[in-house]
Amino acid sequence: MAATTTTSSSSRIAYSRHNIPGLHSDSLNPKSISFSSNLHTFSLKSSGSRRQLYSRRTGAVVIMQSMDKVEVDISLSPRVNSVKPSKTVAITDQATALVQAGVPVIRLAAGEPDFDTPAPIVEAGINAIREGHTRYTPNAGTMELRSAISHKLKEENGLSYTPDQILVSNGAKQSIIQAVLAVCSPGDEVLIPAPYWVSYPEMARLADATPVILPTSISEDFLLDPKLLESKLTEKSRLLILCSPSNPTGSVYPRKLLEQIAEIVARHPRLLVISDEIYEHIIYAPATHTSFASLPGMWDRTLTVNGFSKAFAMTGWRLGYIAGPKHFIAACNKIQSQFTSGASSISQKAAVAALGLGYAGGELVATMVKSFRERRDYLVKSFGEIEGVKISEPRGAFYLFIDLSSYYGVEVDGFGSINNSESLCRYLLDKAQVALVPGDAFGDDTCIRISYAASLSTLQAAVERIKKALVTIKPPVPV
């Protein structure tokens, strides 16, 4: 069967002006990233003869025009139609395509450490292959790894979990979505402080739950106001998702604030908490990390999520985990058994080696964190010198979430209007050839996210490009 494909113009995110040779003509056309809906022309062979069947889309049905009329329903489920594609993935993919086409784009959109996986971890993975550890593992993960995670949580986080209260998955993202699916019923509410990681609201929608967004402000370092949380709680409130250190802001919740939040949570029997702690080791003193489940009364209602991608530079190894009360972990385990089954045996052997590097990853992780801190300090200083920029200094992770809204409401010759974070990021890609993520992807349209998971020299070049591009924009005089 041969098929030719054309693309509808629905479902697109305005973003780029570059035409890339060899790619679909609409996938990187001026100002757009496209998510295609396909129309097909089918060519079939039958009884030695060939009939052309041309299709057109009518609503959600493809009408096959031939001697025989066949209708094929290509509609998608309401669930998947309610979910937005990830902007961070789309922008990262587009920036990569531009680079491959010869456009010298500096990519600061992806949340991926630029360091190689530490050598002892790599060696453990290689040895796993050589020694024949290449078969299926138990769905929940190997006992060796779950025991190592149990020890880590006890020593580093003050949390007591047995191996059967831990589930290893193909990345922390899988751990989170399985938890949301396990505890949420249709109509339940999932409370999410904004700015948020792009996937949290979509995960709630996939579970037929309703995301309830709790806005924060840059003046308060993007930290959740406990009073706002309490005002938004209803009988439908089922889940609160916390991320500290935060993607996209780098904010770190101090213990005192977490205790205030815990006091509110304790008054609501239905309310559970997912504590996303994937960036726990990428933290800058004097900030410290507190696991939410370690607070009084919170162990029974908290699902702690972590993984190996960020601190150990193991993004491609795809390994995360969740720990919590056995009742909830068993439910997540059941879902995983029907989704993916167990995670990679090779990655699990490598993860055991990662946890064996020492407390908080030892010197290898400390060296990476030192570099991240130097980069953060450079960016905070550099952007602090630019007129109209507001900054909340990150205390962890490797993102700078800066307010550039003073540059909105401007018409730029040869480009057009800059009215929001998306058009500003598109302008910076077009004018400065720097790929960033608009803040509206994270629930705050006043800001843009810059990943400093790149070398200092790369960041210096990016800052110079951004400064030159912003010079042509005259920010409105503050009232």
From Swiss-Prot:
Keywords for the protein's UniProt record, in alphabetical order: Amino-acid biosynthesis, Aminotransferase, Chloroplast, Plastid, Pyridoxal phosphate, Transferase, Transit peptide
Subcellular location: Plastid, Chloroplast
Pfam families: Aminotran_1_2 (PF00155)
One function term, GO molecular function aspect: identical protein binding
UniProt catalytic activity: L-aspartate + 2-oxoglutarate = oxaloacetate + L-glutamate; L-arogenate + oxaloacetate = prephenate + L-aspartate; L-arogenate + 2-oxoglutarate = prephenate + L-glutamate
Organelle transit peptide residues: 1-79
Summary of the tissues where the protein is detected: Expressed in flowers, pistils, stamens, ovaries and at lower levels in leaves and sepals.
Cofactor(s) in the UniProt record: pyridoxal 5'-phosphate
Pathway linked to the protein: Amino-acid biosynthesis; L-phenylalanine biosynthesis; L-arogenate from prephenate (L-Asp route): step 1/1; Amino-acid biosynthesis; L-phenylalanine biosynthesis; L-arogenate from prephenate (L-Glu route): step 1/1
Quaternary structure (record): Homodimer.
Protein name from the UniProt record: Bifunctional aspartate aminotransferase and glutamate/aspartate-prephenate aminotransferase
Species of origin: Petunia hybrida (Petunia)
